[in-house]
Amino acid sequence: MSGLAYLDLPAARLARGEVALPGSKSISNRVLLLAALAEGSTEITGLLDSDDTRVMLAALRQLGVSVGEVADGCVTIEGVARFPIEQAELFLGNAGTAFRPLTAALALMGGDYRLSGVPRMHERPIGDLVDALRQFGAGIEYLGQAGYPPLRIGGGSIRVDGPVRVEGSVSSQFLTALLMAAPVLARRSGQDITIEVVGELISKPYIEITLNLMARFGVSVRRDGWRAFTIARDAAYRGPGRMAIEGDASTASYFLALGAIGGGPVRVTGVGEDSIQGDVAFAATLAAMGADVRYGPGWIETRGVRVAEGGRLKAFDADFNLIPDAAMTAATLALYADGPCRLRNIGSWRVKETDRIHAMHTELEKLGAGVQSGADWLEVAPPAPGGWRDAHIGTWDDHRMAMCFSLAAFGPAAVRILDPGCVSKTFPDYFDVYAGLLAARD
């Protein structure tokens, strides 16, 4: 798939089968950093093999962490109290789950570092995190536009003077980065560290993932709802010995959607009713749209209508603040709804791998949908009968755009996905697995 300029999707009618999900990106990169900061050795299984995890692994090795060879999703990491290499230039691609947490960890440890990424990474805001780290006395310099990467870290005087405040309305990754790095400073300073959230915290389920994983590495965070989080002065990460990564719930959304529009059943394994990921709630969205959703320990299964034969999903008007990544799948499913669909509270889309509101608006219109959008919302009216149009779908160097629009193959238009290799960010084999679930139109 890598290197292909485009992929013409075969017209699809039915979808059925079972998919073993790749490891969660959000969990994988968090666990890699926590294992590096923890005392002892951690064997990680089920690790996602993707661009973003390779970026994190390469950065940890460059910082002097002992990282074993990755084989079949397994890797062993020897933790360090602080990174042995105190001067380095790190290239972190477009991996926000690597860039933000590493920025915080490096700033609070001390040293001299330069962090950069691809051009889009340099358009993704980081100013709120930098402002919070500067409250600890961290020396951080913008090497380009203020508020954005690339960054130079070093030269500060780290201290704890009281609670640190961080804006919560732009990205939950800023709070995640501070939480994960705070035990390093709490232990060294001998002081409790309190992080206070300013504004309305978005994407709260991702903070739940962070807190859950920190606890598995021995650090329990005291909290006052979503307003304040305190890390005790004696907090210390300890490797759990062995850590299994659960499947990616955001990736599950595409396959569960296939079951909802292709009849099904489609079952995903690796996530289930006991998942720590908020995006499993997307299954409830599918149920609200009329799909039959079933859960078990470590699996979710969907059955639904056959949209290629005239079946329709129920239209929706919903707040997707808690599941912004899976919400993109809902936007493409709106092509098959029985009326206009509205996605609200998705402002975080603007600062993801691309401006996802603009990108989704543009590509859905190509297929004949009626689309309106605003700062934090998107409304999609399905194409009228006879109104579908053949389309070359731009993916905007965004893995989720490519995977979402694979669902368009169930409509009556010819669909070409441009740059399908962008799925390598999280799921290099996506289109092969997708094809295995489809039955071509008669």
UniProtKB/Swiss-Prot annotation:
SUPFAM superfamilies named among the record's database cross-references: EPT/RTPC-like
Gene Ontology terms describing biological process: amino acid biosynthetic process; aromatic amino acid family biosynthetic process; chorismate biosynthetic process
Assigned protein family: Belongs to the EPSP synthase family.
Cellular location(s): Cytoplasm
InterPro entries given in the database record: Enolpyruvate_Tfrase_dom (IPR001986), Enolpyruvate_Tfrase_sf (IPR036968), EPSP_synthase (IPR006264), EPSP_synthase_CS (IPR023193), RNA3'P_cycl/enolpyr_Trfase_a/b (IPR013792)
Keyword Transferase: yes
Full protein name: 3-phosphoshikimate 1-carboxyvinyltransferase
Pathway(s) the chain acts in: Metabolic intermediate biosynthesis; chorismate biosynthesis; chorismate from D-erythrose 4-phosphate and phosphoenolpyruvate: step 6/7
Annotated catalytic residues: D325
EC number: 2.5.1.19
Positions that bind 3-phosphoshikimate: K25, S26, R30, S171, S172, Q173, S203, D325, K352
Major subcellular location class: cytoplasm
Binding residues annotated for phosphoenolpyruvate, in chain numbering: K25, G96, R124, Q173, R356, R400, K425
Top-rank lineage group of the source organism: Bacteria
GO cellular component terms attached to this protein's record: cytoplasm
Any GO molecular function: 3-phosphoshikimate 1-carboxyvinyltransferase activity
